[in-house]
């Protein structure tokens, strides 16, 4: 059961199809032998495996530290001009990948709307709106949006085709779309990818920035859950968490590679139709179950 949840997390966290919608169905058919509190904690913490997959796959684009040797002659000249330069040069030699630092600042800027708007209301929204009706409607609505956005996108060329071209203003706008994902069933990756396409990025840039944006957001969510839950676990709970994280990691690697290969030749319409069908199935199943008692 834990392996199944790890597989679902690894797939649905990165494909724009809503992990919540799938987890509702899994929870209906696969009963987990754990407390409600630990299950909620587990479903958040296994996201660490998904985050680690992004870090591993995109290490070269994300890691801002590297050693660049400055010629000795130039180093001596700078050191003679300024006594402080000798100390500063040590830092410059090791930590000088400006483009990657700028990318991280863009990621942090994109996180601002979530921190200011979504985070304070997250528990309230989860309590009031985490039900099959809201999830099903969100699945269908965002499925329709994907189709409409792709139809609109056919008539124009993207203005941002690389992460280097992504401005701070555009990053912030994508961050605003991420706020929408606080509603269960929307999909964090789905809302930010739609946002990225609407503000003029290519599909590849929208997807990659979505992956990178997930690192601080999902890590923060996992850390917050850990603090709330406490740091005391039974050996069985530790094994459950480790298994879920490891499975989510390997499946996420496959899912990310698949998505990036897929969008080079195709648009997101297939995911839109999938969401619509899934939303109808979720709504139909639970209405039928409640009607039949």
Q: At which residue positions do the language-model features occur?
A:
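Multi-pass membrane proteins that catalyze or facilitate reactions on polyprenyl-/lipid-phosphate substrates
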Residues: 1-293
């Amino acid at each position: 059961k834990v392996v199944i949840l790890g597989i679902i997390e690894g797939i649905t966290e990165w494909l724009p199809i809503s992990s919540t919608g799938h987890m509702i169905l899994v929870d209906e058919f696969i009963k987990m032998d754990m407390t409600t509190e630990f299950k909620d904690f587990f479903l958040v913490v296994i996201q660490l495996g998904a985050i680690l997959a992004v870090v591993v796959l995109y290490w070269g684009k994300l890691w801002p530290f590297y050693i660049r040797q400055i010629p000795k002659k130039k180093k001596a000249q700078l050191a003679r001009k300024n006594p402080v330069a000798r100390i500063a040069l040590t830092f410059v030699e090791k930590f000088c990948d400006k483009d990657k630092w700028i990318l991280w600042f863009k990621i942090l800027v994109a996180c601002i709307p979530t921190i200011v708007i979504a985070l304070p209301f997250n528990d309230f929204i989860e309590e009031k709106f985490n039900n099959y009706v809201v999830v099903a409607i969100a699945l269908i609505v965002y499925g329709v949006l994907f189709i409409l956005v792709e139809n609109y996108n056919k008539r124009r060329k993207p203005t941002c085709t690389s992460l280097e071209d992504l401005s701070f203003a555009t990053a912030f706008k994508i961050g605003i779309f991420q706020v929408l994902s606080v509603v269960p069933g929307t999909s964090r990756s789905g809302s930010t990818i739609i946002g990225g396409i609407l503000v003029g990025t290519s599909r590849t840039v929208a997807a990659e920035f979505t992956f990178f944006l997930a690192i601080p957001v999902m890590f923060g969510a996992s850390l917050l859950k850990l603090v709330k839950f406490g740091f005391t676990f039974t050996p069985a709970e530790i094994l459950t968490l480790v298994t879920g994280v490891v499975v989510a990691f390997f499946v996420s690697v496959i899912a990310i590679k698949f998505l990036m290969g897929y969008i080079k030749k195709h648009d997101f319409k297939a995911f839109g139709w999938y969401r619509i069908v899934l939303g109808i199935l979720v709504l139909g199943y639970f209405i039928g179950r409640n009607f039949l008692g």
